[in-house]
Each structure stands twice: as C-alpha cells, then as structure tokens.
A protein has these predicted regions:
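Bacterial N-terminal signal peptides
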Residues: 5-14
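Asp-box/BNR beta-propeller blade signature and adjacent active/binding-site loops
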Residues: 17-375
C-alpha cells in the first residue's frame, strides 16, 4: 500500500462514524454521525429535526468554519441541513440554508417546526460582533423544505445578547400557540447575568408577546427546554450553575411562569432536553448526570449523558440509564425528535477530549422506544 493511500485511509477513519466504547454499547441504541469534524469545518452541533411532507426527515444545525476562533462560540458558522430517508440512520444531501450577513458574528442555533397545519418553519439567530446583540430570524417553506423565505424577526438588534444557546427550539402547543423559549441579559453573552423568557404567538408567527422572566442566582437561568402535558400545563427544564437542572411551570400556555425549583437531579452547567414520552403521560429529561464541582469552570463535566423519567409531571424522577458515559468525552447541545414509530433520535455535540473546540462532531443516538421502559 502506498504511503499516500495509507494517509488517506487514516484520515477517513479519524472522522468516520463514532467509536462507541464497549461499556456504552447497548442493543437498543445505535449511534450515527450526522456531520463529522474536518480541518475546514471543525465543529457542527445544535441540531433540530422535523418530518417533511414526503416522510423524509430534515435536520438543521450550525457548522463552524476554520479561521479566527474557529470552533468556539464566537467563530464563524452558518446554518446547514441534511435529509434522511431511513429514520435517521444515514444523512445526505448537505445544503447551506442561512448564510452570514453583513454585521453578523455568525448565524447559529437553528430549530425546525412542522405545524399541525403542515407549515414548515425555521428559526435561526444572527449573533452580532462582540456577543452583546442579536437578531432572531423566522423563515418559512411552502415547498417541503426545498427553499425557505424570510418571515420577519422575533427581535432585532437586541440591547444585550438574547439567544437560545445549545437548546434551540420552536414549539407548537395543543392550542396552536407557537412558543419560543430563550434567555439573555443586558451585556456580553459570556459575562452577562441571564433570565429566561418565552415568546408566544397566536397568529402563526406574525406577532409575538413575551412572558414574565424566570430568574436564578449566579449566572442565572439559561437554555429552557419545554414539554406540554395533556392538561396543557407546561414544564420547563433549565441550565443552571446551582448543582443541576431546575424546573419551572406554566398553567397558562407560557404567558406566566412560576418560580423555578430544584429537580433533584445533579449536574454541572450544561443544557438539557425535556420531552413527553410517546404513548404515555410521562416526561423524560436528557442531561449530564455529573458530579457538581464548584471549582470546575462549568461546575462539572458534560458526561455521562443520562436520561431520567418522571410519572408525576416532574415532581420526582428516576434514572433510566446512560446514553453515553465515556469519562473523557463531552456530550451537550441536545435535541430529541420522535419518529412516527415512537423511537427517539437524540442529537448531541460530541467532543473527545472534552472541552476541545478543534474537533466537534454532530452525532445522533437512535433510541428504541422500548429502552425508555427498561427493556
């Protein structure tokens, strides 16, 4: 074998599908790579999935480019998409959807929503230089995701950084109300004290109203993830620096939120993903069940990636198990989509070694519905 061919094979292997340690291999969970890291595109993450009218799946995510601060939150990234014809096992047809514009630091954190009426909506955040201002953009597609057209802004040139971070989402409630959780403050993204709000729209996204703020100590409340119960009560999980996820509730479809409370689950400062479990009234929470460490720069590691389940609307939780638990890895920026069969596609940012920003892959865990029942 020639030396050149050997080097090519080594390079391909280095960025192939994720290698799952033996202790993480589970028959009910399959791990796939949606976008691998390369020299020119060192980081991809923060994904969102929706089903297209032709039953294919579309994923959107941000992809960083090499250059100054490449791979870091304030590097240059754009919004890309891929599609899957096999329920998330393989992803193809990469396409850039939203480019950076003049005055952007980057365009980040997209989310897709296909409404009950069949509309396909896309949001993405234009972060402006120095991380102290942003614009939240809304797009719509009338041709099954082949193209997206601007539908206006949820906010424009904010005073202080407003964002969704690694937990981007746009929800449609049972009533048809659109709901967008976000957080921010009056300063720089990396130094400001944060509150969480929700924007809500009852006219398909033409106009938006804002909820009351959700506040916590230290860096504040961040990266809200929302689930709706049958009685239309909402539950929100929150990223905090206080020892683990906190929870907040709304009984009026997101217009007002009660004071957040501890979840009883331990972890550092990292995002969560809260979802209703299909075929049950329960909710599940994906989070990093790490030891809280007040001396750690993020108050704990972002491993293991764990799932907990609650049968009483988040009052108590039991750990189902770990999705991944490599002690040298980092798993965060989570999103979960359920297929028509009830199986989960959990997207996550994968970095190994943890906290490196030179090689970050966008991966997905394909989780059989039975896994959540312990079988």
């Amino acid at each position: 074998m020639s030396r050149l061919l050997l080097l090519v094979l080594v390079a391909i292997t280095a960025f192939s599908a994720p290698t799952v340690p033996a202790f993480d291999q589970q028959p009910s969970i399959q791990h796939v790579t949606i976008e691998r890291a390369t020299k020119n595109t060192p980081r991809s993450d923060t994904a969102s999935i929706a089903q297209l009218p032709d039953d294919r799946l579309m994923v959107v995510y941000h992809k960083y480019e090499s250059g100054t601060r490449s791979g870091h939150d304030h590097g240059v990234c754009r919004i890309w998409s891929k599609v899957s014809e096999d329920d998330g096992k393989t992803w193809c047809h990469p396409r850039m959807l939203v480019d950076v514009a003049k005055g952007d630091m980057n365009v980040q954190a997209p989310a897709l929503l296909r409404t009950k009426a069949g509309a396909l909506l896309l949001i993405s955040l234009r972060a402006h230089p120095k991380g102290n201002s942003s614009t939240m953009c809304l797009f719509g597609s009338t041709n099954g995701g082949k193209s997206f057209s601007p539908r206006g802004f949820l906010w424009s040139r904010s005073n202080g950084q407003l964002l969704q971070g690694g937990t981007s989402s746009l929800l449609e409630l049972k009533s048809g109300r659109l709901l967008l959780p976000y957080h921010g403050g009056a300063g720089n993204q990396w130094k400001q004290k944060n509150s969480v709000w929700c924007l809500y729209s009852d006219d398909g996204g033409k106009s938006w109203q804002r909820s009351n703020p959700i506040d916590l100590s230290k860096r504040g409340a961040m990266e809200g993830s929302v689930a709706e119960f049958d009685n239309e009560t909402l539950l929100m999980s929150l990223r905090t620096q206080l020892g683990g996820p906190f929870l907040a509730r709304s009984v009026d479809a997101g217009r007002t939120w009660c004071k957040p409370v501890v979840s009883g689950l331990e972890g550092g400062e990292s995002g969560t993903c809260l979802r209703r479990l299909p075929g049950s009234g329960d909710v599940i929470l994906f989070f990093n069940n790490s030891k809280y460490n007040k001396d750690h720069h993020h108050f704990g590691e972002r491993t293991p990636l764990t799932c907990a389940r609650s049968a009483d609307q988040g009052k108590t939780w039991r750990i189902i198990g770990n999705i991944l638990a490599d002690p040298r890895a980092e798993y965060t920026n989570l999103d979960c989509f359920f297929t028509s069969q009830g199986d989960a596609i959990l997207t996550y940012m994968y970095a190994r070694p943890a906290w490196n920003r030179d090689r970050i892959q966008l991966n997905a865990a394909l989780i059989a519905r039975r896994w959540f029942d312990g079988s």
